[in-house]
From Swiss-Prot:
<dbReference type="Pfam" id="PF03548">
    <property type="entry name" value="LolA"/>
</dbReference>
<dbReference type="InterPro" id="IPR004564">
    <property type="entry name" value="OM_lipoprot_carrier_LolA-like"/>
</dbReference>
<dbReference type="InterPro" id="IPR018323">
    <property type="entry name" value="OM_lipoprot_carrier_LolA_Pbac"/>
</dbReference>
<keyword id="KW-0653">Protein transport</keyword>
<keyword id="KW-0143">Chaperone</keyword>
<comment type="function">
    <text>Participates in the translocation of lipoproteins from the inner membrane to the outer membrane. Only forms a complex with a lipoprotein if the residue after the N-terminal Cys is not an aspartate (The Asp acts as a targeting signal to indicate that the lipoprotein should stay in the inner membrane).</text>
</comment>
<dbReference type="GO" id="GO:0044874">
    <property type="term" value="P:lipoprotein localization to outer membrane"/>
</dbReference>
<keyword id="KW-0574">Periplasm</keyword>
<feature type="signal peptide">
    <location>
        <begin position="1"/>
        <end position="25"/>
    </location>
</feature>
<protein>
    <recommendedName>
        <fullName>Outer-membrane lipoprotein carrier protein</fullName>
    </recommendedName>
</protein>
<comment type="subunit">
    <text>Monomer.</text>
</comment>
<dbReference type="GO" id="GO:0030288">
    <property type="term" value="C:outer membrane-bounded periplasmic space"/>
</dbReference>
<comment type="similarity">
    <text>Belongs to the LolA family.</text>
</comment>
<keyword id="KW-0732">Signal</keyword>
<keyword id="KW-0813">Transport</keyword>
<dbReference type="InterPro" id="IPR029046">
    <property type="entry name" value="LolA/LolB/LppX"/>
</dbReference>
<dbReference type="GO" id="GO:0042953">
    <property type="term" value="P:lipoprotein transport"/>
</dbReference>
Length: 208
């Protein structure tokens, strides 16, 4: 009788602990927020692949990325074409030397077109616009807005807050896969997040 009672008590305790743990486990949104908050910034090299809906590699590229949270970033593509994306937290510049043009946006405008911005500011209200799931170190974000033109955005970030890369899955099935290498933690210098418009280039100011 004592053995039966002990077995029942043990089972009840295990069940209670299991329910307690589940109730207090961090949600994917909270876990993502926590991991992104661990480091104030980083710099890295990146490699990029664009995969067609049919599974073919249609483009490969590489470059460098620098981030200082909140909201500062410098994204420099060196191949296949040279271009530069810089944000000072308020204004975003996109410079294409090949066509000699600079496009200027408010950073708030760019989130829909460039979900990468989500990585840089880690703003709690942003995550409310997504259904977030977690599988290991990969977090998948799906927009909740019915009229959103975004597909899925996947962030690969480990338990120490080191971002390993991210993926953009378009609604038509095309994928952009970005992998970070040679990651160096720490905020880059502030002057890395300023941009001076070169002389003679065309300026397309979309802030108005």
């Amino acid at each position: 009788m004592k053995k039966l009672f002990s077995a029942k008590l043990f089972s009840a305790l295990v069940l209670s602990f299991s329910l307690f743990s589940t109730a207090h486990a961090a949600s994917p949104k909270d876990e993502l927020n926590k991991r992104l908050s661990m480091n104030g910034g980083f710099s890295a090299d990146f490699s990029q692949q664009v995969i067609s809906p049919e599974g073919e590699t249609v483009m490969e590229g590489e470059g460098t990325v620098e981030i200082a949270r909140p909201s500062l970033f410098r994204w420099s593509t060196t191949s296949p074409d040279e271009n530069l994306l810089v944000s000072d937290g308020k204004t975003l510049w996109y410079y294409s030397p090949f066509i000699e043009q600079v496009s200027i946006y408010w950073q708030e405008q760019a989130t829909e077109q460039t979900p990468f911005v989500l990585l840089t500011r880690n703003r709690a209200s942003d995550w409310d616009n997504y259904k977030i799931s977690q599988k290991g170190d990969q977090f998948t974000l799906i927009p909740t807005a019915v009229d959103s033109t975004q597909g899925q955005f996947q962030i690969n970030i480990d338990a120490k807050g080191v971002v390993k890369g991210f993926n953009v899955v378009e609604q038509d099935g095309q994928k952009g896969l970005f992998t970070f290498n040679n990651v160096k933690l720490g905020k880059p210098k502030a002057d890395r997040f300023t941009f001076t418009i070169p002389n003679g280039v065309e300026v397309d100011d979309q802030r108005n």
